[in-house]
């Protein structure tokens, strides 16, 4: 296996706490978090890293207040519409993982529209985890299998049934905000990922912080089970 960095995944944690520290509503933290998304994805694109997957909205996030969920859905839709020029200027294409059918119809339509409009771009792919949970993803993949496939299934063929399909496994998984857990994010794809945890809240995370995480990754010895 190559140690070349092909796929970064990020659990973007800390928006709410960032806002609370400043006496602001949680919504302001989410808005500020989008600014971080733009600068980090631009940096990843400039570095020529093929994939970055962002944990935008989990299957568990529906447990939040109706007002916050509604705000987040609106923010996602607004962001996708507003950034088409950014994607074009940077040759970025958008992909989606998660249970698309479980999202409001207007969000489904916007995701499909942006995915179609950016599909010809050949640079970095931003993979948006929206209504995503690894357990849900794996269960949906199992349900796609017919009896013949089930009898001959192996790791490679099962991987293709997952939302990520042919996207390479995660090399570096970053979590901001101080927590040290995966939170049901890309469990199958992160089997051999290097984990990087930082106390910095997502809205405060900088391009320099990204470079530090990548430099730390480069120093790791990835053995993949070997001695």
From Swiss-Prot:
Say what the protein does.
Catalyzes the condensation of isopentenyl diphosphate (IPP) with allylic pyrophosphates generating different type of terpenoids.
Q: Which PROSITE patterns match?
A: UPP_SYNTHASE (PS01066)
Enzyme Commission number, as recorded: 2.5.1.-
Where is substrate annotated to bind? Answer: 14-18, 26, 30, 58-60, 62, 64, 175, 181-183
The UniProt keywords, alphabetically, are: Magnesium, Metal-binding, Transferase
Q: Which gene encodes it?
A: uppS
| Record-level Gene Ontology MF annotations | ditrans,polycis-polyprenyl diphosphate synthase [(2E,6E)-farnesyl diphosphate specific] activity; magnesium ion binding
Q: Where does Mg(2+) bind?
A: 13, 194
Read off the InterPro entries from this record: UPP_synth-like, UPP_synth-like_CS, UPP_synth-like_sf
Q: What top-tier enzyme class does this entry carry?
A: transferase
Task: State the oligomer form and interacting partners.
Answer: Homodimer.
The name of this protein is: Isoprenyl transferase
Which species is this record about? Treponema denticola (strain ATCC 35405 / DSM 14222 / CIP 103919 / JCM 8153 / KCTC 15104)
Cofactor note as given: Binds 2 magnesium ions per subunit.
A Pfam family recorded for this sequence:
Prenyltransf
An example Gene Ontology biological process: polyprenol biosynthetic process
Fetch the PANTHER family from UniProt: DEHYDRODOLICHYL DIPHOSPHATE SYNTHASE 2, DEHYDRODOLICHYL DIPHOSPHATE SYNTHASE FAMILY MEMBER
Which residues are named in the active-site annotation?
A: 13, 61
| Superkingdom of origin | Bacteria
- SUPFAM superfamilies in UniProt: Undecaprenyl diphosphate synthase (SSF64005)
| Family indicated by similarity | Belongs to the UPP synthase family.
Q: Which cofactors does this gene product need?
A: Mg(2+)
């Amino acid at each position: 296996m190559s140690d070349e960095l092909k796929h970064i995944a990020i659990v973007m944690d800390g928006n709410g706490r960032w806002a609370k520290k400043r006496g602001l509503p949680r919504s302001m933290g989410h808005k500020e978090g989008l600014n971080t998304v733009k600068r980090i994805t631009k940096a990843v694109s400039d570095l020529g890293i093929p994939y970055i997957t962002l944990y935008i909205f989990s299957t568990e996030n529906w447990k939040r207040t109706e007002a916050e969920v509604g705000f987040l859905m609106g923010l996602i839709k607004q962001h996708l519409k507003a950034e088409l020029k950014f994607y074009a200027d940077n040759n970025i294409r958008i992909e989606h993982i998660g249970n698309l059918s479980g999202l409001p119809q207007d969000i489904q339509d916007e995701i499909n529209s942006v995915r179609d409009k950016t599909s010809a771009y050949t640079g970095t792919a931003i993979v948006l985890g929206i209504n995503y949970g690894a357990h849900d993803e794996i269960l949906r993949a199992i349900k796609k299998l017919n009896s013949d496939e089930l009898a001959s299934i192996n790791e490679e063929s099962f991987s293709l049934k997952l939302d990520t399909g042919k996207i390479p496994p995660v090399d570096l998984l970053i979590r901001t905000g101080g927590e040290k857990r995966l939170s049901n994010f890309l469990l199958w794809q992160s089997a051999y990922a290097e984990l990087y945890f930082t106390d910095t809240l997502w809205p405060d995370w900088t391009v320099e912080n990204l470079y530090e995480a990548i430099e730390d990754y480069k120093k790791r010895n990835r053995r993949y089970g070997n001695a």
